[in-house]
Amino acid sequence: EDCFVPWERVFLAGEWQHGGVLALLFALFHRHSYSGCKPAIGDIVLGTAALAAEVNNIHKASHVREKLAEIILTTELGYAAGYTASDLGKPEVYMPGVGFVPYGPGSYIPHSIYCNVGRCLTGEAVFREAEILCDLAGGVVATFPHEKDFVNPETGPQLLRYTKRNPEMPVEDQAQFWRYLGDILCSATGGIVNVGNYHGGGSPIMEQIAITTQYDIESRKKLVRYIAGMSGGDRDALAKALPWTSRKK
């Protein structure tokens, strides 16, 4: 505390608020990047789910369509939130206890609400997507014979015969797919990846805290007060709160 620090090496001199902003910005940019990263993983999950149904020869079933649509919805909504966060970016930051304030110089910061919405939405879906893969695959991913049994001349021909699910697909491709999906669903690495995808960038509860802390809930209450004929209502409250209404043309 008593050491001499040259002024050119002083970054903060009593502006303690920037310390909190630094932590918030780290999380914010991480969550923004997640809104691009996780949709890309969603593309892999979607392709895996579609192939699992095809290998099992159930790809025309209605429940498969529903599951694929669910993955697409989550993927594209997460991407849309990240894209919107970029489009609504401004040189401003949310400062606890103060609200959104100009922050620079010149760095455009993605919109906090949409960063958190995209991260929370796609993060919460991680284990649901794993459940869909497990459901479409069946138990074969956990019980599939070892590869050495397929090259064994005594057991190989019978294994190829009895593990064939779709007559329109080469059985060798089917076997290779189940090994691939087994690595995703049944391996230690697969489990670690799922936990990382769920908590990376901040657990969902952290996004929920950020969203409800920073979102202008009061303006929505004022609008409903106006609609309901209560005192303290404001028909224009929501228009004042929407981020795109305050953008510079």
Q: Which residues are covered by each model-predicted region?
A:
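Loop-to-helix element that buttresses phosphate recognition and phosphoryl-transfer chemistry
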Residues: 69-91
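Glycine-rich beta->alpha junctions and the first turn(s) of the following alpha-helix
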Residues: 1-76
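A structural signal for well-ordered alpha-helices, especially hydrophobic packing surfaces
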Residues: 53, 75, 79-82, 126, ...
